Amino acid sequence: MLDIKFLRENPEIVKENIKKKFQDEKLVLVDEAIELDEKLRQEKNKGDELRAQRNKTSKEIGALMGQKKIDEAEAAKAKVKEINEALVQIEEDTKKFEAELKERMLVIPQIIDESVPVGKDDSENVEVEKYGEPVVPEYEVPYHVEIMESFDGIDLDAARDTSGAGFYYLRGDIARLHSSILSYARDFMIDRGYTYYIPPFMIRSEVVTGVMSFAEMENMMYKIEGEDLYLIGTSEHSMIGKFINTITDEEKMPLRMTSYSPCFRKEVGAHGIEERGVYRIHQFEKQEMVIICKPEDSMNFYNELWKNTVDFFRSLEIPVRTLECCSGDLADLKVKSVDVEAWSPRQKKYFEVGSCSNLGDAQARRLGIKLRGEEGTYLAHTLNNTVVAPPRMLIAFLENLLQEDGSVKIPEPLRMYMGGKDKIVPVK
């Protein structure tokens, strides 16, 4: 959410930003917000003036009564009553204008960084750099579910019976591999100086609307019926929410956190052949990174975050690339974002395995996350990035480390979590 003062003083900048995001239908919101802001300030000024008059008149009543000027005192009382009635209406109008203004401000997008490439959608995202050599082996790489089934490691049919489409049972070596990757990711981030958290897996609506746009909320979040609680789509939601309405001394910055959680997503609109199997699912687990920092440091930490993911995947011998998200692909709260994509030997292309985002002060403004410095308090900046999100990451892992005999190589960093195994062998 933008600062209303910034919008008031820079409406053309805000409108140009909306155009860059190809959301021209929102242009009218800028003028509406400015008009509502003016009405709101007028009402507040009228209220202040009337309260001052009321205070002055109330003092006069006592003096008039002391002078036995009863008629004048009664007239003053009537005036106070009239002012009170006017103030009631002003307070109602003020609340109405505040609500209408907030409604518009919440959907006006954050100002994107000037380095963000302009494009309509994800088809216009820009490749930044490749890490590792993408290899297509001479032998066939089966579909990831077939690889898992060769280890007797997945049961989609039973999951459909218990839960419906978009769920799965993992078992045996595949389940152990899944858990081992998460354990390695946890320790990988702890070794890089991040504090490990396991947060709540449900959050209140106040936090939901603080950490994401309404469009994201509608497409992602599952609501708990009868309660003001939502299942989280990522632990970023809980971790940022942890700091709602807080003021932290700036010398404690940055706060580097890494958090584990299950994630629950509707995945509205998911479709296509690669949505089969465990590519897009309603429930998965993830290790996340979250940073809260001073505004001037956020771009440096943004680069630190995506590099962590690249280093993690490369430590497991998986080729990846970074893809700069264009203006039209950025969610409304994001200032800048880069996807990390892993190589798929079977598909002969890259696919997303993580997303790194700098949200500037958008979440901090919505949630009241402030820092305290020598010159007073100010809004923090928030950033997040995926370390790893199996089972999607398992697709990249199994395809890239599959051997010709059907076994899967276990890279050295992962072996201590897999009981010392240097490979897992299919049972079918």
Model-derived segments and their meaning:
Residues 27, 130-428:
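TRNA-recognition modules of translation machinery and tRNA-sensing kinases, especially anticodon-binding
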Residues 1-134, 149, 153:
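N-terminal alpha-helical targeting/anchoring segments
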